[in-house]
Amino acid sequence: MVCDGACVDVMSDEAHCGGCEQPCAPGEACTAGACVPQCDEGTVLCAGACVDTNLDVAHCGGCDVACDSGDPCVQAQCDAVDVVHLLITGQSLSNGYSSAVVSTMQPHGNLSFNTGVRAGAMGLTGFIPLVETWDGAHGETIASGMANLAGNLWAAAGFDARTFLVSAHGVDGFNYSKVKKGTPAYMTGMAQVMAGQAIATALGQTYEVRAMTAIHGESDHIDYPPEGNPGYAANLVEWRADYEADIQAMTGQTTPVRFFYCQVSSWTAYGSAHSLIPEQQRMTALANPDRLYLVTPKYFLQYTDGVHLTGEGTLLLGEYYGKALRRVYLDGLPWAPLGPSAAIINGVDVVVDFAVPVPPLVFDEVAVTNPGNYGFAFSDGSGNPPAISAVTLSGPTQVTVTLSGAPGPQARLFYAALGQPGAAGGPTTGPRGNLRDSDATPSLAGQPLYNWAVHFELPLN
């Protein structure tokens, strides 16, 4: 067609869309002679609007593919599973050793086996409401905090709370070699999966195992002196892969089994200034961002004995797992904690950029006492490194550590990674730092679930 003295294709020309002098508005494209929204990368045009088919409940996985009311769209699939099983493994912290019972009521529809959270492998014949119990040595686990906070977050987003079945099968004091595939502890976990699917099926419900969670690593520090198991990173990867392979073979599910775990934060209680375990936990999650998730460190929580958490501390830790579950299973995005993303030396300044879930960064000396320099330390291999003269927030996602002189060639920055041998773990004594973000996600008790910076050590050259 001739418009303004020129031949134009009115089927695609944005100045003459469908006819001469019929321009499309800014942000619209001319498609088949009609002005339609020009969709950004990652979205598609459905019913005249740009939508993300990975998350849109009306167009889940494609246009006009709607999820049932109350079900979210996660990674282009409607999440309608009736019973979602979350497994807990590890050692005494995973079993709630010395943690007083806090969670005695079930606010949602979350479940345990009839034998309780620490379910064992025998007599698993039904489901009961998820609450915590005391067995003479163990009480509150992360189960209730994790599942109940997740339920709150699902409801706050406008969806039906998922029904989480949670069961623990860790063993006090066991390092990885004693809980890995082939051990009685591992087989107890598989027995719980088999029973979970059988009971759900008998009730006419669909069932999947979504995640294995762990509180672990302390014994892999103790049993491999002086600083811990150097192969722990490979153990974490193997651990998850074994769970996924065996669970998928057993249940027939194709959904991946993701691994959520926290950092060891109490190695000083065992007489060590430094541990190899926390950095391996951090780096393994960074190397496997779609399957392994480091949830949080534990230095800001309250402890009973410098190693084990109080009931309130365990409940709070569980809520951090619940927050990570929401990120992965409702938002459909990888979880990453507050941690460093880049660091450079600029004269006497070490400038560290952080991946911050919710900016801005804050130095909090109320929840955690300042161990000196907000938890930062510096070494350069010289035996006489320059001292830290200042630590400042140089941006909403940046920290600058200023040294007293030029660093040597083996410069290394530490955060909450060095402590006093013999010191109890915790917010006033253990290896710790004061750096957190501004996440206002409310806990079950109403306080904000700030993300605290993970233990880390960074080579700078």
Region annotations inferred by a language model:
Residues 1-80:
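Cysteine-rich modules of extracellular adhesion/ECM and protease-associated proteins
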Residues 81-461:
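Cell-envelope and extracellular/periplasmic
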